[in-house]
A protein has these predicted regions:
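Active-site-proximal gating segment of KS-fold condensing enzymes and close homologs
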Residues: 77-95
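Conserved "HGTGT" condensation-loop signature of ketosynthase/thiolase-family condensing enzymes
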Residues: 1-77, 95
Length: 95
């Protein structure tokens, strides 16, 4: 096993559903201006599938970008603030 790490490919998978600040304002008492002025956020993605499913798609895209097969990967790291479950980790679901 190598003693260093390389980023040899990357992939992403974003849910198609978008919730704008105006959409948010129709549900709670807020406005686009209020949200943007305090957070800089104008829209967010909304997923109806587990994050591990999105991560798996992104992982396959990263492998294709790098020209690698899954068995050639020594380590999988997943970072998220919205895990599918506390235990096991999202990385375990993706693996």
């Amino acid at each position: 096993m190598a003693k260093y790490a390389d980023i040899t490919g990357w992939g992403k998978c974003m849910p198609p559903a978008v919730m704008t600040n105006d959409d948010m304002a129709s549900v709670i008492d807020t406005s686009d201006e209020w949200i943007v002025s305090r957070s800089g956020i104008s829209e967010r993605r909304v997923s109806h599938v587990p994050g591990s499913d999105l991560a798996a798609v992104a992982g396959h895209r990263a492998l294709a970008c790098a020209g690698l097969q899954p068995e050639e990967v020594d380590l999988l790291i997943v970072a998220t603030c919205t895990p599918d479950t506390v235990i096991p980790s999202t990385a375990a679901h993706v693996q």
